[in-house]
Amino acid sequence: ARRAALGERLRTVIGHVRHEIGHFLFSRLVPTEGFAPGFRALFGDERADYADALARHYRSGPPPGWEAAHVTGYASAHPHEDWAESAAHLLHLVDIADSAAAAGLGIEGLARGEDAYAEADAARLLDVAARLGLALNHVTRAMGLEDPYPFVLAPPVREKLAFAHGWLRAGPPGAEAGPGR
């Protein structure tokens, strides 16, 4: 009911947690040299009035055609939300690819046991994960269920996801190197 009331096609606890992690990661990355100019070129100026933007979004909804540049309608509300939604969807997609590889599910471009978190090529990762998402949608439709990943990754969305991928792999200065870095 809440999902429908908010016009959200996917509303899960893990999605919410990943979205909030996106906000946290932004706060860690924004002071990093080079992050803000690239961010603003893709997402817009995060210094725009946040309260006004959210009030407008909840009053009027997303603008017509939001799908051409945003992963969700909510992402169109403000650059902060665009980043948080993009980061959350990147985490969804990496986990889809990683889970499929761990389960031995075959799809061209993804080897059994491959570590999707270590993938340095954002375009390759997004291609594989988007195809897996589509495959999952087909499988669940065969069972009469809703799509688990009902999103279209338009080229500007893929560009934002790739930007997030690059910065999340690099991390802020002083971040400890983890797998794939």
Each model region followed by its residue ranges:
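Short glycine/proline-rich turn/loop motifs
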Residues: A1-A5, P64-V71, A116-Y117
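Short pre-active-site segment immediately N-terminal to the catalytic Zn-binding motif
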Residues: A1-V17
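Residues at structural and domain junctions
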Residues: G7-R11, H70-G73, A77, A122
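Residue-identity detector for threonine
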Residues: T12-I14, T32, T72, T140
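Hydrophobic alpha-helical segments and helix-packing faces
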Residues: I14, R18, A77-H80
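Catalytic glutamate of the conserved HExxH
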Residues: H16-L29
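Post-HExxH zinc-binding segment in Zn-dependent metallohydrolases
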Residues: F26-W83, A87-A97
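Pan-zinc metallopeptidase signature
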Residues: A75-R181
